[in-house]
A protein has these predicted regions:
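C-terminal motif of bacterial Sec signal peptides marking the signal peptidase cleavage site
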Residues: 12-14
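Ser/Thr-rich, low-complexity intrinsically disordered terminal regions
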Residues: 16-151
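Sec-dependent signal peptide recognition
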Residues: 1-6
Protein backbone atom coordinates (compact mmCIF):
# COMPACT_ATOMS: atom_id res chain seq x y z
CA UNK A 1 0.00 0.00 0.00
CA UNK A 2 2.83 2.35 0.85
CA UNK A 3 4.43 1.84 -2.57
CA UNK A 4 1.15 2.55 -4.34
CA UNK A 5 0.88 5.80 -2.40
CA UNK A 6 4.43 6.80 -3.42
CA UNK A 7 3.75 5.96 -7.07
CA UNK A 8 0.51 7.94 -7.00
CA UNK A 9 2.28 10.88 -5.38
CA UNK A 10 4.99 10.78 -8.05
CA UNK A 11 2.37 10.68 -10.80
CA UNK A 12 0.56 13.67 -9.32
CA UNK A 13 3.78 15.65 -8.88
CA UNK A 14 5.07 14.75 -12.31
CA UNK A 15 8.11 12.57 -11.77
CA UNK A 16 9.96 14.50 -14.39
CA UNK A 17 13.68 14.89 -13.93
CA UNK A 18 14.99 18.42 -14.14
CA UNK A 19 17.11 19.20 -17.15
CA UNK A 20 20.79 19.27 -16.32
CA UNK A 21 22.45 22.33 -17.80
CA UNK A 22 26.03 21.92 -18.91
CA UNK A 23 28.36 24.89 -19.45
CA UNK A 24 29.22 25.59 -23.09
CA UNK A 25 32.89 25.92 -22.13
CA UNK A 26 35.06 25.69 -19.05
CA UNK A 27 37.13 28.88 -18.83
CA UNK A 28 40.10 29.70 -16.59
CA UNK A 29 38.28 32.56 -14.84
CA UNK A 30 34.91 30.87 -14.54
CA UNK A 31 33.36 33.76 -16.49
CA UNK A 32 32.44 33.69 -20.19
CA UNK A 33 35.57 34.44 -22.20
CA UNK A 34 37.06 33.91 -25.64
CA UNK A 35 40.00 34.80 -27.85
CA UNK A 36 39.38 36.67 -31.09
CA UNK A 37 42.07 35.90 -33.66
CA UNK A 38 43.50 38.88 -35.56
CA UNK A 39 40.89 41.29 -34.17
CA UNK A 40 41.82 44.62 -32.66
CA UNK A 41 40.49 45.78 -29.31
CA UNK A 42 39.09 48.89 -31.00
CA UNK A 43 36.94 46.93 -33.48
CA UNK A 44 35.70 44.59 -30.76
CA UNK A 45 34.99 47.52 -28.44
CA UNK A 46 32.76 49.01 -31.14
CA UNK A 47 31.04 45.63 -31.67
CA UNK A 48 30.23 45.30 -27.98
CA UNK A 49 29.03 48.92 -27.72
CA UNK A 50 26.64 48.33 -30.64
CA UNK A 51 25.44 45.13 -28.95
CA UNK A 52 24.67 47.07 -25.75
CA UNK A 53 22.81 49.73 -27.73
CA UNK A 54 20.72 47.05 -29.47
CA UNK A 55 19.76 45.71 -26.03
CA UNK A 56 18.58 49.20 -25.07
CA UNK A 57 21.35 49.55 -22.49
CA UNK A 58 23.13 52.78 -21.63
CA UNK A 59 26.84 52.77 -22.44
CA UNK A 60 28.59 53.87 -19.25
CA UNK A 61 32.16 53.46 -20.50
CA UNK A 62 33.72 52.63 -23.85
CA UNK A 63 37.45 52.33 -24.39
CA UNK A 64 39.87 49.95 -26.09
CA UNK A 65 40.14 47.94 -22.88
CA UNK A 66 36.57 47.95 -21.57
CA UNK A 67 32.95 48.40 -22.56
CA UNK A 68 30.56 48.78 -19.63
CA UNK A 69 26.80 49.06 -20.09
CA UNK A 70 23.93 49.71 -17.68
CA UNK A 71 21.13 47.36 -18.69
CA UNK A 72 17.48 48.38 -18.46
CA UNK A 73 15.78 46.19 -15.86
CA UNK A 74 12.12 45.99 -14.91
CA UNK A 75 10.69 47.38 -11.67
CA UNK A 76 10.03 43.81 -10.54
CA UNK A 77 13.68 42.88 -10.94
CA UNK A 78 14.70 46.10 -9.16
CA UNK A 79 12.42 45.25 -6.22
CA UNK A 80 13.82 41.73 -6.04
CA UNK A 81 17.36 43.09 -6.19
CA UNK A 82 16.75 45.60 -3.40
CA UNK A 83 15.26 42.89 -1.19
CA UNK A 84 18.14 40.54 -1.95
CA UNK A 85 20.98 43.04 -1.60
CA UNK A 86 19.88 45.26 1.30
CA UNK A 87 17.14 47.24 3.00
CA UNK A 88 14.73 49.53 1.22
CA UNK A 89 16.94 52.58 1.85
CA UNK A 90 19.31 52.65 -1.08
CA UNK A 91 20.05 54.23 -4.41
CA UNK A 92 18.47 52.95 -7.58
CA UNK A 93 19.63 49.47 -8.49
CA UNK A 94 21.67 48.90 -11.65
CA UNK A 95 22.51 45.82 -13.71
CA UNK A 96 25.81 46.05 -15.56
CA UNK A 97 27.42 44.03 -18.31
CA UNK A 98 31.12 44.61 -18.91
CA UNK A 99 33.40 43.36 -21.67
CA UNK A 100 37.10 43.41 -20.70
CA UNK A 101 39.46 43.38 -23.70
CA UNK A 102 43.09 42.27 -23.35
CA UNK A 103 45.60 42.43 -26.21
CA UNK A 104 47.60 39.26 -26.83
CA UNK A 105 49.81 39.78 -29.87
CA UNK A 106 47.52 40.14 -32.88
CA UNK A 107 44.65 38.59 -30.92
CA UNK A 108 42.25 39.96 -28.32
CA UNK A 109 41.12 38.07 -25.22
CA UNK A 110 37.63 39.05 -24.02
CA UNK A 111 36.06 38.32 -20.64
CA UNK A 112 32.41 39.14 -19.92
CA UNK A 113 31.20 40.15 -16.44
CA UNK A 114 27.60 40.78 -15.43
CA UNK A 115 26.34 41.98 -12.06
CA UNK A 116 23.70 43.90 -10.15
CA UNK A 117 24.66 46.64 -7.69
CA UNK A 118 23.32 49.46 -5.56
CA UNK A 119 24.66 52.00 -3.10
CA UNK A 120 23.39 51.91 0.47
CA UNK A 121 23.47 54.82 2.96
CA UNK A 122 27.04 55.58 3.99
CA UNK A 123 28.34 55.07 0.46
CA UNK A 124 28.92 51.31 0.58
CA UNK A 125 28.36 49.47 -2.71
CA UNK A 126 26.61 46.11 -2.60
CA UNK A 127 27.14 43.87 -5.61
CA UNK A 128 25.78 40.49 -6.71
CA UNK A 129 27.40 38.75 -9.66
CA UNK A 130 25.20 36.96 -12.18
CA UNK A 131 26.89 33.58 -12.07
CA UNK A 132 24.20 31.12 -13.10
CA UNK A 133 24.72 28.68 -15.96
CA UNK A 134 21.85 30.34 -17.85
CA UNK A 135 23.70 33.67 -17.88
CA UNK A 136 27.06 32.01 -18.50
CA UNK A 137 25.81 30.02 -21.51
CA UNK A 138 24.00 33.02 -23.03
CA UNK A 139 27.13 35.19 -22.81
CA UNK A 140 29.41 32.39 -24.05
CA UNK A 141 27.05 31.70 -26.97
CA UNK A 142 27.15 35.40 -27.89
CA UNK A 143 30.97 35.29 -27.98
CA UNK A 144 30.80 32.18 -30.18
CA UNK A 145 28.32 33.89 -32.50
CA UNK A 146 30.55 36.87 -33.23
CA UNK A 147 33.56 34.78 -34.19
CA UNK A 148 35.60 33.78 -31.17
CA UNK A 149 38.12 31.01 -30.56
CA UNK A 150 38.06 28.96 -27.34
CA UNK A 151 40.29 30.09 -24.47
Amino acid sequence: MRYIFILALCALMGCEEKEVIEPLAITPSGWPEAIFKNKSRKSLSETFAVHCAKLGATIVEESETRVKCDENISEGVKSWGRAFLCTGHSSDIHAYIQFNLIKRGADTHVKVLNWMQLQIPGGQIRRKDYNTLYYYNDAQAYLYKIGRQPV
